[in-house]
Curated annotation (Swiss-Prot):
GO biological process, one term: vesicle fusion
InterPro entries listed in its UniProt record: SNARE (IPR010989), Syntaxin (IPR045242), Syntaxin/epimorphin_CS (IPR006012), Syntaxin_N (IPR006011), T_SNARE_dom (IPR000727)
Source organism of the structure: Aplysia californica (California sea hare)
Domain t-SNARE coiled-coil homology: 194-256
Name of the protein in question: Syntaxin
Length: 290
C-alpha cells in the first residue's frame, strides 16, 4: 500500500499544532537547543508565507471581481507579494546554512545522533517550504490565466476578437497599446474597458516578474528535496516498521493476556477438583474408620 511520504513523516512527529517535529529523544546540549530555536523560527516564517499566500488568493479574487481597478487593493497585493519574497529568501538562506553545517559534520561524525536529527528536521522543513512555494507559484499562474480570460472578454466587448495564441503574443510584447489598436473609444464605458484591459496586462507583467524572481530559488529547493528522497524513504520505512512493531506488540500482548487468563481458569478448575477429591477421600476414610 502506497503511502504519502509527508503523511508518514507526520505520523512520526510530536508537535501537536502542525506535526512538523519528528518525535525523537533530543540531546539537551546548548548546541541542539539553539538548533531547535532555528527550526522553530524557520517554521514560523514558512507558516507566515503560507498565510500570506492565502491572503494573495483572496486579493486575486477580489481584484478580478471588482468592476473597476482598485488601486488600494493592488497596493496591498504588491505588499503581500513583496513580503512573501522577502521571507522566502530568508527561509532559503537559513536552510542553506543548516545544509552546509550538515555537510561539514558528515565528514567528521557520520554516526552522530544529533546529526541524524538535524538532517531529518532539515528535510522536513525543506519539503514544507517547497510545498508552500509551489502553492504560491500555482496561485500566480492561476491568476495570470484569469487575467487573460478577463482581457479576452473585455476585448470582445469592444468588438475585437482574439485567439489564445494572439492574446499570448500581445501579452508577451509588453506593450499594452497593442490591445487598443483599431478600437474607437467613443464612450466612457469604452474608456473604462480599455483601462481595465491595460490594468490586467500590467498585472500579468508584474506576475511574470515575480515568478522569474522566485524561479531559481524554487528550482534549487525542489532539487534539494528530490535529492533527499532516499532519506525520506528511509524515514518512511522506519516509521512504518515502528508502527508495525507496535501493532505486533499489541497483538502479542493481547494474546498473552488471553493465554494467561485461560491458564488461570484451568488452574482454578484443577484446584476445585482437588478440593472436591480431598473432601470425598476424607468422607470415605471417615466412614471406614467409623
Amino acid at each position: 500500500m502506497t503511502k504519502d511520504r509527508l503523511a508518514a513523516l507526520k505520523a512520526a512527529q510530536s508537535d501537536d499544532d502542525d506535526n512538523d517535529d519528528v518525535a525523537v529523544t533530543v540531546d539537551s546540549s546548548g548546541f541542539m537547543e539553539e538548533f531547535f530555536e532555528q527550526v522553530d523560527e524557520i517554521r514560523e516564517m514558512i507558516d507566515k508565507i503560507a498565510s500570506n499566500v492565502d491572503e494573495v488568493k483572496k486579493k486575486h479574487s477580489a481584484i478580478l471581481s471588482a468592476p473597476q481597478t482598485d488601486d488600494k487593493m493592488k497596493e496591498e497585493l504588491e505588499e503581500l507579494m513583496s513580503e512573501i519574497k522577502k521571507n522566502a529568501n530568508k527561509v532559503r538562506a537559513k536552510l542553506k546554512v543548516i545544509e552546509q553545517n550538515i555537510e561539514q559534520e558528515e565528514h567528521t561524525n557520520k554516526s552522530s545522533a544529533d546529526l541524524r536529527i538535524r538532517k531529518t528536521q532539515h528535510a522536513t522543513l525543506s519539503r514544507k517550504f517547497v510545498e508552500v512555494m509551489n502553492d504560491y507559484n500555482a496561485c500566480q499562474i492561476d491568476y495570470r490565466e484569469r487575467c487573460k480570460g478577463r482581457i479576452k472578454r473585455q476585448l470582445a466587448i469592444t468588438g475585437k476578437t482574439t485567439t489564445n495564441e494572439e492574446l499570448e503574443d500581445m501579452i508577451e510584447s509588453g506593450n499594452p497599446a497593442i490591445f487598443t489598436q483599431g478600437i474607437i473609444m467613443e464612450t466612457q464605458q469604452a474608456n473604462e474597458t480599455l483601462a481595465d484591459i491595460e490594468a490586467r496586462h500590467n498585472d500579468i507583467m508584474k506576475l511574470e516578474t515575480s515568478i522569474r524572481d522566485l524561479h531559481d530559488m524554487f528550482m534549487d529547493m525542489a532539487m534539494l528535496v528530490e535529492s533527499q528522497g532516499e532519506m525520506i524513504d528511509r524515514i518512511e520505512y522506519n516509521v512504518e516498521q515502528a508502527v508495525d512493531y507496535i501493532e505486533t506488540a499489541k497483538m502479542d500482548t493481547k494474546k498473552a493476556v488471553k493465554y494467561q487468563s485461560k491458564a488461570r481458569r484451568k488452574k482454578i478448575m484443577i484446584l476445585v477438583c482437588l478440593a472436591i477429591l480431598i473432601i470425598i477421600l476424607v468422607g470415605v476414610i471417615g466412614g471406614t474408620l467409623g
